[in-house]
Amino acid sequence: MSNSIVIQTNSTVIEDMKQQYKHSLSPKTPQGGIFMAKVPSCTITAYKSGKVMFQGGRAEAEASRWQTVSQTPKTAVKKSVDSHRYAPPASIGTMSIVGSDEVGTGDFFGPMTVVAVYVDAKQIPLLKELGVKDSKNLNDDQITAIAKQLLHVVPYSSLVLHNEKYNELFDKGNNQGKLKALLHNKAITNLLAKMAPTKPEGVLIDQFTQPDTYYKYLAKQKQVQRENVYFATKGESVHLAVAAASILARYSFVKQFDELSKKAGMPLPKGAGKQVDIAAAKLIQKLGKERLPEFVKLHFANTEKALRLLR
């Protein structure tokens, strides 16, 4: 389902956005526009009026990244993303819960990793001491150092969807949102089985789609966790369980990515920018186009861009 969200912001934030999306800028800019950028499953268009439009399957997720820094009053962005019956209670930050998060969805090279973590309320001070916070604010070395300690402290379930399987499932009509839902649900149910008979006070999923859509994606699954499940964007700032899940998911992704680079016999860049197109073109020259599905998410625009570089 394609969404369209508009936020109102200022020129400073728009400049920050342009810098953030510099590797994804489109050469075309609409009339009255400052820039247009295309990232996986979302097109961002900023206008001189201060309006910024997000279109596509990840419109909500991309818009939510900017809503706290923009001058948007309490508008439809916040409402459309976080206003639902699955919103976490105000006290969730001090509860003993399972948190889940995913990494790798915006990277052309590499797998998708999802991790669910259980954090007992008594462990929250320890996690803070270990430096657990949003993994986006940590470099790979920091991630590795914290993750190695976390692995011995918290119960967790870690899943990796390798590129070949990812592409196979995508070709069968499963979009990225559905694949994420399947992995989150599987990681959560695996962890709950591992923890039994201990039961968490709740489950917090770092929200990537509307909860009703999430459960729609899981309609054919035999085992679906529904009891005390909450969804929130920027879940890592809501409870450290999500931040811990984010760190372990990134740690797993980095390890898998390093293995993939070794397999390719060349360094592979993260993200989905121009440097990725160049690396993919080199990889095709080196190993052949038929090997590409082992390394990349084929539905990304980078596939066609890499092939164009070789023509």
From Swiss-Prot:
CDD domains: RNase_HII_bacteria_HIII_like, RNAse_HIII_N. Residues 95-311 form the RNase H type-2 domain. GO terms for biological process: DNA replication, removal of RNA primer; mismatch repair. This is Ribonuclease HIII. Keywords: Cytoplasm, Endonuclease, Hydrolase, Magnesium, Metal-binding, Nuclease. NCBIfam families: rnhC (TIGR00716). Endonuclease that specifically degrades the RNA of RNA-DNA hybrids. It comes from Bacillus cereus (strain ATCC 14579 / DSM 31 / CCUG 7414 / JCM 2152 / NBRC 15305 / NCIMB 9373 / NCTC 2599 / NRRL B-3711). The gene is rnhC. Manganese or magnesium. Binds 1 divalent metal ion per monomer in the absence of substrate. May bind a second metal ion after substrate binding. It catalyses: Endonucleolytic cleavage to 5'-phosphomonoester. HAMAP family: RNase_HIII. Belongs to the RNase HII family. RnhC subfamily. A divalent metal cation binds at residues 101-102, 206. Signal peptide: none annotated. Its cofactor is Mn(2+); Mg(2+). GO terms for molecular function: magnesium ion binding; RNA binding; RNA-DNA hybrid ribonuclease activity. Its EC number is 3.1.26.4. The keyword Metal-binding applies. One of its GO terms (cellular component) is cytoplasm. It is found in: Cytoplasm.
